[in-house]
Amino acid sequence: VTQIESTRLCHNCTTLGGNSGSVVFDLTNGQAVGLHFSGSFLATNYAVRADVVKKLLDDIHSGRWRRQPGGVSLTFPADGGETDLIDETESVASDYSDRGGYDPEFLGSRFVVDLPTVTRHADDVLDFEFDGETQTELRYEHFSVVMSRSRRMCFLSGCNIDGNLSKKSARVRWKGDPRIPKSQQIMKECYGAPPKFSRGHMTRREDPGWGTRAVAKRGNEDTMHVTNVAPQMQAFNAPIWLALEDYALQHAREDEMKISVFTGPYFTDRDPDMYGVLIPLTYWKVIAFIHDDTGKLCATGYEMSQEQSLQPEEFVFGVFTSPQLGTATQVPIRSIEAKSGIHFGKLASVDPLAGDEEGVSDAGPRTPLLALEQIRFVR
């Protein structure tokens, strides 16, 4: 799969006349990803996306197609039922006085990695009073969040992950953070059942869940603050995007198994207003760790767009199940800095893509990550 569009995908294979209607399979899992319908010699082939075909067939069988001359809305929430509920219990700011937040020295005193700094929109960083001083960093267990005042969601979330001490904990309900005004947090407006959006974690729920049983539980539960999310379609969560941290842990120094991860949305003038909220079209992620082979600090950057899932009149298709259909790409950290207005300190200089000037701009197509093995960790 070389490209994904709203109703079709492009694929690279050999076809002959009469192949139209043939199923395009993902060879990694045997699942159907589309129906081939045309091609251009030595250029590309086209297929109707499998989810589009399924939706049309479902509508025909149910009779809905006769009653829907216009666009339809269909998506699948990332979380349903209890997991989408808000915890109405009022917590107090003092409950967070023991949260250490993101630790710059987590990877070692020789490899200090500071929390990224919002530079271009510094005047839009939300500040708040806590412990007798003005702060801009919401500290949680093993991670921190920096909020945008105008967008009411985070500029970034930075997390320390210790793979050796990871523990699983039960999921809890979503909740607000009492340290900042409720008016600066998006509780429900754009979130809910389809066609609304899912709450997409910036710091993954599992990532700060490490340490003693009590500490791991607190880290897990802290990720369920609405300050740590942004609006995402379920189709956005492609397997490769979700697996980036785990793959980096496999390449981190074996005796430590530690990485630091930063995630956030790009805020642009193109972001559509839906349900009274400006919806980010693209997200970025930066991962830093000590490479097991070199013993040196390494950092890699990634992007993933959900724009293909946001169609006019909320014409949104269902989730793909094939990892071949992810649109995550590895990009230079300097490119992320330029587009986000966030400075990552020394990380841009230890990026294996540093010096790739072509990659800093948006000119030309980028190769999607179809397999984790495509990721470059060293120059």
Per-range role (PLM):
Residues 1-10, 51:
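Chymotrypsin/trypsin-fold serine protease catalytic domain
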Residues 18-20, 33, 42-44, 166, ...:
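Eukaryotic short linear interaction motifs
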Residues 8-11, 29, 38-40:
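Terminal export signals
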Residues 79-379:
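Domain-level detector for secreted/extracellular nuclease and nuclease-toxin modules, and
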Residues 2, 14-35:
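Catalytic nucleophile loop of clan PA
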Residues 37-86:
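C-terminal cap/linker of serine protease catalytic domains
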Residues 8, 23, 34, 45-47:
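Structural detector of coil-to-beta-strand junctions
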